Amino acid sequence: MSLAHLRLLLSSLESLAPLSLAGSWDNVGLLVAHSRPTPEATPPYNVYLTNDISMQVLEHSLTAFDGQPASLIISYHPTPFQALKKFTLESPASRVVLTAAAHNTAIFSPHTSWDAAPSGLNDWLLDGIVGALGEGGAAVRARGPVRLAAGDMGARGAGDGRAATLAAPTTLAAVVEGVKRHLRLGSVAVSLPASCGAAAAGGAEAVRAAAQGVPVSHLAVCAGSGGSVLGGATSANVWITGEMSHHELLAASAAGVAVILTHHSNCERGFLPVVAGRLGALLGDRAGEFRFLVSAVDADPLTTL
């Protein structure tokens, strides 16, 4: 990929979600790149979107475009995430970096900047769930971040997590079905509020029955691992995220909050096609200079059998 085309893509990605919105602990932006482009490379350049980069995903990206490699991988989760003290093939993260560099494939990660951005991942997650409640979706009376970003970006609706107050109450059972419908999942994990008593001890059918009687007028979402963020959504009846710790779940239940867990990346991956479409729209007349492909082999490592 030419440096001019790489800069054009990076500028478009910054327009979608400024990297300044990412957590201070995060590793975002252009993580792997050659200083010089491949001389024979010409448009269209190949852009591969994935939630995570395992070696299986990387190997697929190297032949996914009619046998040609990706010029740029946009990976929601960063690789590397933590600092690498050495680069050897024995380390999974350094193996990915070395292999990508050897094929002149750049790696970009937005991670928490996508989470916090207005119209970003958490807005997509909330809107999709609310829109999947019942036949025509549910009306929302109020909405916003669980934790507002500072400054001008906060005024524009940026921040961590998203919460919404429904115009009319629904049930936990309906929200469960809405989550499954939006994320195209066959199952999710559900933690009941303590008011449901010992229903959880009765197994799945008892939990389903109890969920029918749990009213929900206020819900909160956080993509990925949302325990620390959702703790601030104190008025919510239900928290929706990918994963939480055992003790976070117990504390939520004791506080009267139901929890729906999807597995970490299952509430993130569906946003990738949306990003591909938005990038194409931003690029306008120059969109034809790129080919976008969402990974067909990237998947959450956990499967419920």
Question: What feature does the model see in each segment?
Answer:
Residues 1-305:
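Active-site catalytic microenvironments in core metabolic enzymes, especially phosphate/sugar-handling
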